């Protein structure tokens, strides 16, 4: 987006940054919606952990807000140490825990 001075406005990128567990990537950029987290390779965030369900959780974006929902997983999903049920709003800095993994939702401003 270009502002009145002709310069380009910065873009905001959101990432799930791995803070516990051994994921195939150190972070996952939240592009598109929905983002699925689970044990199967077809998930946006595939995690090799027997404590994570095949389709464990889903993150969607609506009107600039991210929501995470546990998909009836066996071991549940936590945000900031609290078990969630139903869609739960996420904010930058929130810690998402499932199985042996924890992620932090980071917001990154990129100058264009």
Question: Where do the language-model regions lie?
Answer:
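Intrinsically disordered, low-complexity acidic Ser/Thr-rich regulatory segments
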Residues: 1-48, 60, 110-112
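Short hydrophobic/aromatic patches on the structural cores and recognition surfaces of FHA
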Residues: 16, 37, 55-60, 64-79, ...
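A short, compositionally biased micro-patch
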Residues: 21, 30, 40, 50-52, ...
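Residue-level detector of beta-strand structural context in well-folded domains
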Residues: 26, 33-35, 43, 57, ...
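Residue-level signature for short turns and capping positions that connect secondary-structure elements
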Residues: 35, 42, 52, 64, ...
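C-terminal boundary/linker segments immediately following FHA domains
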Residues: 46, 67, 78-112
């Amino acid at each position: 987006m270009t502002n009145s001075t002709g310069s380009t406005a910065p873009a905001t990128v959101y990432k799930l940054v791995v803070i516990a567990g051994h994921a195939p990537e150190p972070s996952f950029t939240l592009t598109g919606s929905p983002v699925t987290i689970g044990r199967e390779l077809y998930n946006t965030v595939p995690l090799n952990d027997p404590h994570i369900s095949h389709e464990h959780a889903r993150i969607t974006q609506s009107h600039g807000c991210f929501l995470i929902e546990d998909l009836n997983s066996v071991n549940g999903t936590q945000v900031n140490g609290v078990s969630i049920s139903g869609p739960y709003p996420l904010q930058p800095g929130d810690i998402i825990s499932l199985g042996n993994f924890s992620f932090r939702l980071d917001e990154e401003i990129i100058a264009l």
